[in-house]
Amino acid sequence: MAGKSPEEEHPVKTYGLAAHDSSGVLSPFKFSRRATLEDDVRFKVLYCGICHTDLHFAKNEWGISTYPLVPGHEIVGEVTEVGGKVTKVKVGDKVGVGCLVGPCRTCDNCRADLDNYCPKMVLTYASPNVDGTITYGGYSNEMVCNEHFIVRFPENLPLDGGAPLLCAGITVYSPMKYYGFAKPGSHIAVNGLGGLGHVAVKFAKAMGAKVTVISTSEGKKDDALNRLGADAFLLSSNPEALQAATGTFDGILNTISAKHAIIPLLGLLKSHGKLVLLGAPPEPLDLHSAPLLMGRKMVAGSSIGGLKETQEMLDFAGKHNITADIELISADNINTALERLAKGDVRYRFVLDVAKTLKAP
């Protein structure tokens, strides 16, 4: 017997914003999602954060995009329907979906709650799904996914400011917990004060760490110290300041995705210090062994987090009232926002107001 067609697999008509080629320009787009399965949650999308990854995918800058492409993996909304076996949430609950909608849940990583390192992971958009179709993201009026990949939003956490935590928040929270350097009595640095960096400062301070922001821009100093509550600011273009900070930090979260030198950062670490890379510059790193040998230092990496840890992160954010600093934008202004994002003209995250501004084509 022949399998179901894509139209039969995905009978629910919906709409969103899609890129159709590597220009990255988004336009209204009609498509379909699957019917609600017994372990699925369907929800109305209220807000969706705009991540720099969305821009990379829309423009096919990593060479793996498939079109049409509906971006968005910082998705929050209100549950409208649940399958008969769903126990995690109910209709009316506020929920979120981050970067993943389909790890295998059987491999060693999945069994260890490391869904984010599953070799068979299904991304929230532009990824082959188990039914052979391509996933579409949260720049759309509704979502449906297995309840395993749903996280619950704390009641006190604003949905718009909380949306970017589903990518930016877990991206900085996970390495702080795993590498153990954000805790009372520790001194960490956040290199780069953008979408990731500003959230990293908030989480690290809430964990009790002393925090220094490192930036190439003197203009970020006031925000770092007075808006975000960092303890110190280090201008990385000032050799004297860097020399004075030698051996200062237990750990450095390196949030920068552009090409930059990392060897000077290693000199800022204490012995046994850890430099954790969160950005992915397109060029290889220039790294020598000597700075690592002298002090038993480590260069490591981290990518988002598993579903269990993402829920833990949201609960922590709710307890400490942590949200991203956002600029809310309408669907009509999505391409302008992406252009500004490419230029770094955002303080600090764009969030798409889906429910109020996204109209059916």
UniProtKB/Swiss-Prot annotation:
This is Alcohol dehydrogenase 9. The lineage of its organism: Eukaryota, Viridiplantae, Streptophyta, Embryophyta, Tracheophyta. Zn(2+) 2 binds at residues 104, 107, 110, 118. It comes from the Eukaryota. It comes from Catharanthus roseus (Madagascar periwinkle). An alcohol binds at residues 53, 73. Belongs to the zinc-containing alcohol dehydrogenase family. Class-III subfamily. Keywords: Metal-binding, NAD, Oxidoreductase, Zinc. Its EC number is 1.3.1.-. InterPro entries: ADH-like_C, ADH-like_N, ADH_Zn_CS, CAD-like, GroES-like_sf, NAD(P)-bd_dom_sf, PKS_ER. GO terms for molecular function: oxidoreductase activity, acting on the CH-OH group of donors, NAD or NADP as acceptor; zinc ion binding. Binds 2 Zn(2+) ions per subunit. CDD domains: CAD1. Its cofactor is Zn(2+).
